[in-house]
Swiss-Prot record:
UniProt keywords, alphabetically: Hydrolase
Gene name in the database record: apaH
Organism: Pseudomonas syringae pv. tomato (strain ATCC BAA-871 / DC3000)
Name assigned to this protein: Bis(5'-nucleosyl)-tetraphosphatase, symmetrical
Catalytic activity of the protein: P(1),P(4)-bis(5'-adenosyl) tetraphosphate + H2O = 2 ADP + 2 H(+)
Species classification: Bacteria, Pseudomonadati, Pseudomonadota, Gammaproteobacteria, Pseudomonadales
Gene Ontology molecular function: bis(5'-nucleosyl)-tetraphosphatase (symmetrical) activity
Length: 300
């Protein structure tokens, strides 16, 4: 059995299928991990969600900010933003079935056997794996509980509080947990968030740094797979931390990582997130040489 992790899809189905065909993914035997942002901005959000639902027994997904935005928009259509490509999902006859499935997904996955965690954006540096799983479970419970669901989504948006405090309660508590897992890039060593800066690692404001670079980070003994940060272009120099968002929806590439061998594969994308007619690049871990392989035609 092979386990593959793939970066942000954002409704880009063609490059995902291209990569899965390239590695000969078998949904009966293999497993596919997804770092979240399954939908939005790309050209095939509905088709992507339907495809993932069809292979759901082979999937491990964590939710990203765009997935949570989909759930919020499904409650209140006026929340649609310029550039959203969610309308087709909202008008689909199977929308309720698809949205119920999205609600059941995690904010954090931890494979104890491999000692690997997967999140969309990151893990607060002051949290251990045990603490992070506990906080993620609070949001997961709110998503799955009909009595808490609406209040959570209504209060989810916002940048405050910027820092975790164990005494936080209610929606305010859930908001900061959500921001760590789905929106974080830069923070201070004690976890104060800067949610406005979105460029590369060298653009941090004084006192802030990429969440994974803090020396006191309590998850340094764990491998972490994450997405969200397209400006990193799928590169992270921090040992044991694997960035998989390589900007597919912006004309970059979609990245697939073999979780056990750490071999990477990339499918080039065009400006709207379709698989480009170019190549798939494959590279062994620690090997700067990239082999160029013609991309296969994605399945329809």
């Amino acid at each position: 059995m092979a386990v593959y992790a793939v970066g942000d899809l954002q409704g880009c189905l063609e490059p995902l299928q291209c990569l899965l065909e390239h590695v000969r993914f078998d949904p009966v035997q293999d497993r596919l991990w997804l770092v979240g942002d399954l939908v939005n901005r790309g050209p095939q959000s509905l088709q992507t969600l339907r495809y993932l639902y069809s292979i759901r027994e082979s999937l491990v997904c964590v939710l990203g900010n765009h997935d949570l935005h989909l759930l919020a928009v499904a409650r209140k259509n006026e929340l649609l933003k310029k550039g959203d490509t969610l309308r087709e999902i909202l008008e689909a006859p199977d929308r309720d079935e698809l949205l119920r499935w999205v609600r059941q997904q995690k904010l954090m996955h931890y494979d104890a056997e491999r000692n690997i965690a997967m999140v969309h954006a990151g893990i607060a540096p002051q949290w251990s794996v045990k603490k992070a799983l506990k906080q993620a479970a609070e949001v997961e419970h709110a998503l799955q509980d009909d009595q808490l669901y609406g209040a959570f989504l209504d209060g989810m948006y916002g940048n405050e509080p910027a820092k975790w405090n164990n005494d936080l309660q209610g929606v305010t508590r859930l908001r900061v947990i959500t921001n760590y897992f789905t929106r974080m890039r830069f923070c201070t060593s004690d976890g104060k968030l800067d949610l406005k800066s979105k460029e590369g690692v060298g653009t941090a404001i004084p006192g802030y740094a990429p969440w994974f670079s803090h020396q006191n980070r309590k998850t340094r003994d764990v491998k972490i797979i994450f997405g969200h940060w397209a400006a990193l272009e799928g590169r992270c120099d921090e040992p044991g931390v694997f960035a998989l968002d390589s900007g597919c929806v912006w004309g970059g590439a979609m990245t697939l990582l073999n979780v056990d061998t750490l071999e990477r594969h990339q499918c080039n994308c065009d400006a709207v997130g379709n698989a480009a007619t170019g190549i798939i690049a494959s590279a062994q871990p620690g090997n700067a040489h990239i082999q160029q392989i013609p991309a296969q035609e994605p399945k329809q």
